[in-house]
Amino acid sequence: MERLTLPLGGAAAVDEYLEYRRIVGEDDGGKLFTPEEYEEYKRKVLPLRLQNRLFVSWRSPTGMDCKLVGPETLCFCTHRYKQHKTDLEAIPQQCPIDLPCQVTGCQCRAYLYVPLNGSQPIRCRCKHFADQHSAAPGFTCNTCSKCSGFHSCFTCACGQPAYAHDTVVETKQERLAQEKPVGQDIPYAAMGGLTGFSSLAEGYMRLDDSGIGVPSVEFLESPITAVDSPFLKAFQASSSSSPETLTDVGTSSQVSSLRRPEEDDMAFFERRYQERMKMEKAAKWKGKAPLPSATKPS
C-alpha cells in the first residue's frame, strides 16, 4: 500500500476541500469554483438552503421512518440523492414534492427510494432486479414485456412489505408537527432526512420519535428470559452475584478484563483464556482440599 505524505498545511487543505464539497455538492459541474464564485454561491444558496430544507424518508404504514435518506442514498434511477434537485427557491404548494434527477439523460422525475437486499437490488414480481426497470414514470421492466410496473414483495425489517412504504418529502414545519426530529440547521447540500448520527440506523433500531421510539418502563424493567441477548444474560448473572463473591473477585479481575494498549485481539483473548483456565484449576484444587481432622475425645 502506497503511503501518502502531505506537505505542511496539506491536512488543512484537505479539510477545506471536504467542506467545499459538502456545501457545493454537484452544483459546480465537476469544475471547482474560484474563491469569488464560491463566496457568491454561499451568499446566494445558503440562506435558501437553511430556510427551505426538505426532509426525505422512506416511511412505513405505521408512521415509522424506516430509512432516512442522505446525500449518498440511491434512488430507483440508480443515481444518488445529491444528484437530484434538492435546493428550491420556494417550497411548492402541491404534494407530494417532486425532486427530479439532474443527471443528463436520466428519465427520473422524482426521487424514489428503493431498499437493498443486503448489497443487491430487490426483485420485482417479474423476477428482475429493480435496476433492470425504467426510471420513467410507470417503472416498466426493460427485460420482459409482461411487467406492468415495478412491484416488490420484499419485506422491510419493520415487518411491512416494501410496496406498502412511501418515499416522503416534507418540510421542517410538517416534521415538527409530527414531533419528529429535525436536527440543527446546517449549510451542507442534500442532507435529506439526516439529523444526527443515529439517522444512519434503520427505523426499528432508532430510539427517537422518527424510529421505534423510547422503550417503555415496563419493557426496561421486565425480567431477562432465555430469548434475550447473551450479553444481557451474562450481565444478569454477574449482577445477581452475591456481594461476597464480588468482594472476593476484587479489582484485579476487573482490571484484567480490560485490553492493554499494546495488545491485539488474539493476544487479549489468549490472555483472558489462560487466566480463566488458571482460575478454574485453582477452584478445582480448592474443592479437593482435605477436610480438617476432628479431635477425638479422650
Curated annotation (Swiss-Prot):
Residues 241-263 are annotated as: Disordered. Residues 241-257 have a biased composition (Polar residues). It comes from the Eukaryota. It holds the Pfam family FAM221. InterPro entries: Fam221a/b. Belongs to the FAM221 family. This is Protein FAM221A. It comes from Homo sapiens (Human).
